[in-house]
UniProtKB/Swiss-Prot annotation:
Biological role: May be involved in transcriptional regulation. May have a role in embryonic development.
Subcellular location: Nucleus
Entry's family note: Belongs to the krueppel C2H2-type zinc-finger protein family.
GO cellular component: nucleus
KRAB domain segment(s): 103-174, 232-299
Zinc finger (C2H2-type): 420-442, 448-470, 476-499, 505-527, 533-555, 561-583, 589-611, 617-639, 645-667, 673-695, 701-723, 729-751, 757-779, 785-807, 813-835
Family matches, as SMART domains: KRAB, ZnF_C2H2
Record protein name field: Zinc finger protein 28 homolog
UniProt-listed GO biological process terms: regulation of transcription by RNA polymerase II
Pfam families: KRAB, zf-C2H2, zf-C2H2_6
Keyword presence, Membrane: no
Superkingdom of the organism of origin: Eukaryota
Molecular function via GO: DNA-binding transcription factor activity, RNA polymerase II-specific; RNA polymerase II cis-regulatory region sequence-specific DNA binding; zinc ion binding
Amino acid sequence: MRGAASASVREPTPLPGRGAPRTKPRAGRGPTVGTPATLALPARGRPRSRNGLASKGQRGAAPTGPGHRALPSRDTALPQERNKKLEAVGTGIEPKAMSQGLVTFGDVAVDFSQEEWEWLNPIQRNLYRKVMLENYRNLASLGLCVSKPDVISSLEQGKEPWTVKRKMTRAWCPDLKAVWKIKELPLKKDFCEGKLSQAVITERLTSYNLEYSLLGEHWDYDALFETQPGLVTIKNLAVDFRQQLHPAQKNFCKNGIWENNSDLGSAGHCVAKPDLVSLLEQEKEPWMVKRELTGSLFSGQRSVHETQELFPKQDSYAEGVTDRTSNTKLDCSSFRENWDSDYVFGRKLAVGQETQFRQEPITHNKTLSKERERTYNKSGRWFYLDDSEEKVHNRDSIKNFQKSSVVIKQTGIYAGKKLFKCNECKKTFTQSSSLTVHQRIHTGEKPYKCNECGKAFSDGSSFARHQRCHTGKKPYECIECGKAFIQNTSLIRHWRYYHTGEKPFDCIDCGKAFSDHIGLNQHRRIHTGEKPYKCDVCHKSFRYGSSLTVHQRIHTGEKPYECDVCRKAFSHHASLTQHQRVHSGEKPFKCKECGKAFRQNIHLASHLRIHTGEKPFECAECGKSFSISSQLATHQRIHTGEKPYECKVCSKAFTQKAHLAQHQKTHTGEKPYECKECGKAFSQTTHLIQHQRVHTGEKPYKCMECGKAFGDNSSCTQHQRLHTGQRPYECIECGKAFKTKSSLICHRRSHTGEKPYECSVCGKAFSHRQSLSVHQRIHSGKKPYECKECRKTFIQIGHLNQHKRVHTGERSYNYKKSRKVFRQTAHLAHHQRIHTGESSTCPSLPSTSNPVDLFPKFLWNPSSLPSP
């Protein structure tokens, strides 16, 4: 096969380190016209043109003429002869070219290898992108592009163009004649392992042309297609191995098969991507390729395939079952676009083994019987022909190997079955390597460790992506907004979410759509209830790994996100973003009902329940409902008695974190909230708001019984207990009940004798803060309460109220026995002692014969006292 076609290979002048240019102008193609910007490639490499660009007739000189910009090469010391072989990136499309023949995208496209692309500087890369995209748009506007080429899709997505793998788009013709040139490879030390020698593996890889992909370098597509009746398929080039190879050997094979398939795809003579190539693209093992014969593949050509009977023979080096398939000779025109991509040819040759297979046709589409399938599953071996039918395979005998012969690895289990099962969770995998990586989840093994931060990973790909965090490398850039990403998947998600709005992944339970499968998988855990991420400290489980990471910072105390304004730190980036709105004043979430704006969306959602009256969170103990789940959680602590927030100074505990923060200000004396009217400061915003109503006169809380209004809700609630008689706070010592909790606290100090509030001037102590405040006015001389009738001032509002009765003549305190009426309770109390016989003297009064007559007068008119 190779010998027959070798005569058509021309011997071009090769570039150093690579093969020669592999294309020349096709007959009938019109000349191309240069665009205003043409790229000069670096001297180290060259682009690989498809159809006529920089062909033999154009390689004499670099592009010249007006509008051509030759970018500087990195290696200016290279010989001038090499610089002459630089090729232009794109060519413009003129109407006159249409008369000489249709122009395709392949006529104006240039490919780069990875090595060549890395030698381009950023200016050259940007120019390449612009020219290629402009050429495609010009062709599309003329209707010359039926579908978007992969290289354009990659450029639009910000990918590097050398990553493009061409999909097979045309007929796969099985009767092609392979033409390649054998190129010797340098021997590498310790290249082989086991029983494979250096000489054997190097000779085999060389004969199959796997290092430099010589088919792509030395093949003249146009000349071949015009002169040869048959075409080359990937099955003529692909090599399968049934013995475990060294990683270096695997790279040799993978790169070669990959590039050969890419070359055939660029020629446009393939119908679908082979399974072998798909597996290599997915970083899977090529021996996992499975073949399953299906029904009729082509209309008009029914009996085009013949399967081969298997002849068993034990082999000590590998396991599995071999099958082989042959094709009848067909022209390209006999194939259609509905080629079954699952039926892909491959060749399974054991390196160093001398094996050949005999051909014995059976009925088309005949599948393996269940009995034979069980036999294959049970034995799990490779079956070969008799020794008498084996042939020695050297470089010449490989050429004699029938081009239609294919040896396929079958395991007795059809495609779609998963072969490797995890013993821990029973999850199955199609590759042993995938199972190995998965098992590290159970063992906790993380063999890949970052030298920068010490973080470890269970697989190499995650480790490679992580390292970009330290290097800052973001190779994937969005062509719309210019945003760059560390991972290609992040770019795709960004592209769908912000630019295209595409959501191709639908939830089968609720129909919700997502832009990537990761979001869908996370969403489905809501339906399944799965929480696979568990905290090692408190054993709390989470649906998402990110939620676990944030939760673990509660235990570690880590707060990596710091505000640039106030230096406050947060454990979550979202919390920092919300906090920064406090400084900026931004409130992006607005209520459509009342126009009130909020900093967080969750606050808006809670606010909307005020309008709807919805209270979906109900306490199971008392049946009380709440509009916010956090309110329910706080309320439930009343029933459980839990007080998780404790003050480190006085050890006082609270049910809410906000209450602890308010309490801590009593120790620090901090009062950050100041009234702009009078300058009075407060430790809480709620106290400031209540105080400001004193100036505005606003009293939004109204009693439904008597209509009395109050400036704060707590005062209104306490007032309503006058009507209901409710006294919910009872002293456990004496059983006395009170309307307010603060009254109970003050009362309990009468039993304990505690007086925590001490005057800093005279040292006098009080059991209540208000008593201390009133006492301090004695030292300061402040009398804030003034009578509007006589302008007399008083220290306490109670004294003012008593004084007002002098003007009104009101006597509110009546003694039932004597029916005597008094203006003040003190007068009434003293009068009662007359009837009880209890002695009472005032230490500040002078000694008189009738202190009873003097004392009431002294209380309301101290000036009437005689001088001592």
